[in-house]
């Protein structure tokens, strides 16, 4: 990590009040910490927009495992793309519903393609890809 450099930011008073309220709500000790997180968030988003960059993310799926062949179809799709899946966790939410969390890593395009294929599988009740970073491009 390089040296820390101070710089100024000019905001109108209403925006600053909202930002300070957000900092309090999120328990940031200083505005600088919040601004650093905002910048990192934009940089992670930029990584994801470059489809050849290696990215990481977590895909969350909720589905009824009693739905005909659904669990088998999801497993088959996961096996087809095993090189993108680092880890998976399967949780029984109740008698019918399961939550599956997949940790993904690979080229952005491959991660997004696999996520969309799993989310759009007939019978999946909920699916969301949470963007993350490998940390290699973030300081």
From Swiss-Prot:
Q: Can you say what this protein is called?
A: Putative nickel-responsive regulator
Biological process (GO), any one: response to nickel cation
Question: What are the entry keywords?
Answer: DNA-binding, Metal-binding, Nickel, Transcription, Transcription regulation
Gene3D superfamilies registered for this protein in UniProt: ACT-like. Chain A, domain 2, Met repressor-like
Q: Entry's InterPro entries?
A: Acetolactate_synth/TF_NikR_C (IPR027271), ACT-like_dom_sf (IPR045865), Arc_rbn_hlx_hlx (IPR013321), CopG (IPR002145), CopG/NikR_regulator (IPR050192), Ni_resp_reg_NikR (IPR022988), Ribbon_hlx_hlx (IPR010985), TF_NikR_Ni-bd_C (IPR014864)
Species of provenance: Solidesulfovibrio magneticus (strain ATCC 700980 / DSM 13731 / RS-1)
Q: What NCBIfam families does its record include?
A: PRK00630.1, PRK01002.1, PRK02967.1, PRK04460.1
| Cofactor or coenzyme needed | Ni(2+)
Job description of the protein: Transcriptional regulator.
Q: Which Gene Ontology MF annotations are present?
A: DNA binding; DNA-binding transcription factor activity; nickel cation binding
């Amino acid at each position: 990590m390089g040296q820390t450099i101070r710089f100024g930011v000019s905001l109108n008073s209403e925006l600053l009040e909202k930002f300070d309220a957000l900092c309090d709500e999120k328990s940031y000790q200083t505005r600088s910490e919040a601004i650093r997180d905002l910048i990192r968030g934009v940089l992670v988003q930029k990584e994801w927009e470059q489809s050849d960059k290696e990215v990481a993310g977590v895909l969350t799926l909720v589905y009824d495992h009693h739905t005909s062949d659904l669990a088998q179809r999801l497993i088959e799709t996961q096996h087809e793309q095993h090189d993108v899946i680092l880890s998976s966790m399967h949780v029984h939410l109740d008698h019918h519903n399961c939550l599956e969390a997949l940790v993904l890593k690979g080229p952005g395009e491959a991660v997004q393609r696999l996520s969309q294929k799993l989310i759009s599988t007939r019978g999946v009740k909920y699916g969301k890809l949470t963007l993350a970073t490998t940390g290699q491009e973030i300081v």
